[in-house]
């Protein structure tokens, strides 16, 4: 018996656009000499005493096992010939807005998930074109022609499947999952590839002998809800390719943060980083409590002279993992110029939030 009715609307046409290695691709576009070389966006460990973290990297660097949130030191060890670029996030945001303007030519139902990806509902669209595949190809062409960057497109009847489709073939991919193809696509898929299924849920499912979509399909809704609570309801539907979540235009992103003002100024690096970790602990606790994950980490520092600095780093993957957020926040601190003034305030904030079980986890 189903606790919640199965409603599977297969009439929608949803496109998920994911820019290919976005930050690194922008750098390659603006500096053609980088093409064909491994490029890492992050602090160069040779200039920071081994400190720093990878924000993202291009596909050449990924061949060496480099990935987002890896320490810059490990990335260098894996790929010593890589070119490290600190990143220009203002430029990336501007390019991201240019891409978003292209989306708006086709539909107003655009839901940005981050600076480099978005869902588009093209069931009804400004072009009056019925084929979502044709629209996706037109969008890819416009992005290449206007912004000189490539993207991958996933097309299906809901957001869950459209995202899986865009991940299926990268870069420059275009994958369509029709309603009668969903089960064949999902059955062999490793459970960790189901976006919205985090590391702890994967471990719990593996312990139950669930490794693929087909394994998940064999479990009843009641048993999944018993084991996972409300998330069991979502898992039951994911296994069947069901997702009723609408495309929400320009959804406002909130943030979760923690900051503290110190009566006694902080000067010692070890003390400062210990306080950063305390802020991160509070942020992670709040993320877990609110079942949120995020992909942009912001560090705020206020000195004794009241100069306030705010710097951020955006990762490719959503996270609520303490170690990743802590490592990134400290890596941001390492990029700040030393000040003769002590620190009176430290803050850590995670933005670009998504519900834990709707978030995207990498990798018609």
Curated annotation (Swiss-Prot):
One of its GO terms (biological process) is SOS response. It is found in: Cytoplasm. It catalyses: DNA(n) + a 2'-deoxyribonucleoside 5'-triphosphate = DNA(n+1) + diphosphate. GO terms for molecular function: damaged DNA binding; DNA-directed DNA polymerase activity; magnesium ion binding. The record marks 23 as: Substrate discrimination. Its cofactor is Mg(2+). Disulfide bonds: none annotated. GO terms for cellular component: cytosol. Mg(2+) binds at residues 18, 116. Residues 14-198 form the UmuC domain. InterPro entries: DNA/RNA_pol_sf, DNA_pol_Y-fam_lit_finger_sf, DNA_pol_Y-fam_little_finger, DNA_polymerase-Y, DNApol_IV, PolY_HhH_motif, Rev_trsase/Diguanyl_cyclase, UmuC. PROSITE patterns: UMUC (PS50173). Belongs to the DNA polymerase type-Y family. Monomer. Poorly processive, error-prone DNA polymerase involved in untargeted mutagenesis. Copies undamaged DNA at stalled replication forks, which arise in vivo from mismatched or misaligned primer ends. These misaligned primers can be extended by PolIV. Exhibits no 3'-5' exonuclease (proofreading) activity. May be involved in translesional synthesis, in conjunction with the beta clamp from PolIII. This is DNA polymerase IV. The lineage of its organism: Bacteria, Bacillati, Bacillota, Bacilli, Lactobacillales. The gene is dinB.
